[in-house]
């Protein structure tokens, strides 16, 4: 069965991206493939590429930064009210209360009750959840994650944060990737309705909810 390919592009594709598109369009159970304007290679998959399947799950296509996204909040202050002195104080507070890596054990926020009470699929992941998961809640991370202040066209002041599920998302990805079965072109997959696939989907949803809670925690500090 041929794969339907949809492209939303701002510039021509690189040869490396074209190779990935060709390979993934021929992978088992890939029915649809979409290419976004920011597409670029990232190992065995491309950031900015989306695949649609019916029976198989490819954890490598999701990656470890499960639930990565953006949140924004508007302040009551206007941009014109913020002086250089205010900015220095704001960024000093951000660097103090919103770590890049993890909180100190003594002052980290607790996991929301829903996340704490909802078990992950393996004791190894549960242990990680209550250690790194707690210590990294409300932290930014590295790479392309960011926290910035913005002023819109009406001079209103905003904060925007881009971050995801931190180390627990990576742990979930690595744990389940070991249970994948070989598929075409060195890709590894989980059968969606098999126990391993069901467990992965549940853990992935947990990580998505954690990522949203992580962004909310950061926004609460800013507010």
Where are these regions (language model features)?
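Glycine-rich, flexible loop motifs
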Residues: 1-33, 47, 53-61, 66-154, ...
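Short polar/acidic secondary-structure junctions
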Residues: 39-41, 54
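Histidine-centered acyl-transfer/condensation active-site motif
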Residues: 157-161
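Short acidic, Gly/Ser-rich segments with clustered Asp/Glu that frequently serve as metal-coordination loops
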Residues: 41-42, 69, 164-169
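Conserved beta-strand/loop block within the catalytic cores
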Residues: 39, 46-48
């Amino acid at each position: 069965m041929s794969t339907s390919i949809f492209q939303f592009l701002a510039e021509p594709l690189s040869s490396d991206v074209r190779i990935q598109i060709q390979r993934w369009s021929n992978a088992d159970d890939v029915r649809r493939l979409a290419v976004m304007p920011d597409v670029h290679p990232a190992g065995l998959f491309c950031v900015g590429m989306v695949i649609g399947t019916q029976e198989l799950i490819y954890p490598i296509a999701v990656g470890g930064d499960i639930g990565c996204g953006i949140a924004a909040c508007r302040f009551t202050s206007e941009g014109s009210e913020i002086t250089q002195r205010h900015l220095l104080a704001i960024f000093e507070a951000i660097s103090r209360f919103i770590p890049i890596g993890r909180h100190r054990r003594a002052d980290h926020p607790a996991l929301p009750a829903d996340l704490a009470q909802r078990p992950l699929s393996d004791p190894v992941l549960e242990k990680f959840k209550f250690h790194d998961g707690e210590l990294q809640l409300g932290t930014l991370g590295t790479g392309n994650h960011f926290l910035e202040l913005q002023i819109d066209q009406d001079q209103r002041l905003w904060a925007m944060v881009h971050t995801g599920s931190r180390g627990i998302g990576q742990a979930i990805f690595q744990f389940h990737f070991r249970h994948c079965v070989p598929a075409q072109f060195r890709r590894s997959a989980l059968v969606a309705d098999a126990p391993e696939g069901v467990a992965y989907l549940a853990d992935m949803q947990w990580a998505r909810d954690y990522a949203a809670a992580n962004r909310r925690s950061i926004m609460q500090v800013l507010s």
